[in-house]
Amino acid sequence: MLIPYKRLFILITLINGIVFFKGLTSWNWFNSESIAIYKISRVILFNFTLAILIRQQYVINLLFTIATSVPKHWPLFIRRICAKVYHFGGLHSSSATMGTLWYFVFVWGIYKSLSNNVYQINNPIVIITTLILALLVTIVIMALPKMRAKYHNQFEITHRIGGWSVLILFWVQMLLFVRLESPSIPLWNKLDFWILIVLTASVIIPWLRLKKVGINIDSPSNHVALTSFDYGVTPFAGSSTALSRNPLLEWHSFANVPAPDKTGFRLTISRAGDWTGKFISEKPNKIWVKGIPTAGVGIVDKVFKKVFWVATGCGNGPCLPHLLLNETPSILIWSTRSPEKTYGEALVNEIKNVQPNAIIWNTDEHGKPDLVKLAYKAYKDFNAEAVICISNQSLTQKVVHNMEYRGIPAYGAIWDS
């Protein structure tokens, strides 16, 4: 059974396929002399508009707000579909991929027009167009799941710097075409101009909130950093904040842990790679943040009457704000090594205070549990409507797949970025 992410990818692919078929037939975009490059450029722009806007923080929060506003008395089958809103990344990857494929057609049209002298294409347009194609292909290749996982830092750099470069070159390309096609028509009378304005604003807005803020770090062990922030932002439960020590190169998002009736928030950062390892070891007193708190998978608990949380390691962090808020009755199973020793007695006691019935499984004492079996039993005993898993990729996929195989609504991160 295909996950919603892949269904969205297929949907956008089919829509583009239909447009391509119509272009081949009734719309007559392709003939022996030329290709309708202006119409194709509009299709390209529409695809990239969707790809960029669907990743904009305000758009993401709006999507989650709409999806989680469904009343809890609505039928479960409707609510479980709405809760899959976090699969919106399928729109991003599909429209970006389709936009790149269409750009190949556009480049073909440019070179065909150059040889036939149909649109009076000049060398600057050819150079800019070729550069854009090279950048797009690089971005798409680095975003392939295996490439992204193996070369994540390089993926991030090509996605960010390459994406900015493409946007700038789109502006240059548009101005060159305007000068070639209709120099007397003001820019503001052209749809492409306004689309590029929107896309540029979408990219710039998060960076307008870039700031370096003070932090306090408590490390109960060399495996974790309990990081506190209080710089005037109190995020909502189920959101994340992006952190960086080098804003141009890499960003890492972590689930916010706000507490009711308190300002600021906390993050639970565990040693899971070079960046987090260095962060925990060096304990910086300042860090870069940008944009706004952005909704994530945990917030979908709002559409259910009862939820069962499954967490491993620092996965307790994303669960904790929901447990503290207690808007949705829930129960937690947390599997981790030596909880008090690793995360500190204060955090463990905080969880126990809000979740007296929480199942805290010490893997150092009892070994790794069969979380699927434990989750299913606890789900039935608690009479929950859904399971939310916060863990590593393989375990999250295992729990979500096995729960859904049993007909149980299940949710967890999908590692699409």
Where are the language model's segments positioned?
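FNR-like FAD-binding dehydrogenase module
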Residues: 1-417
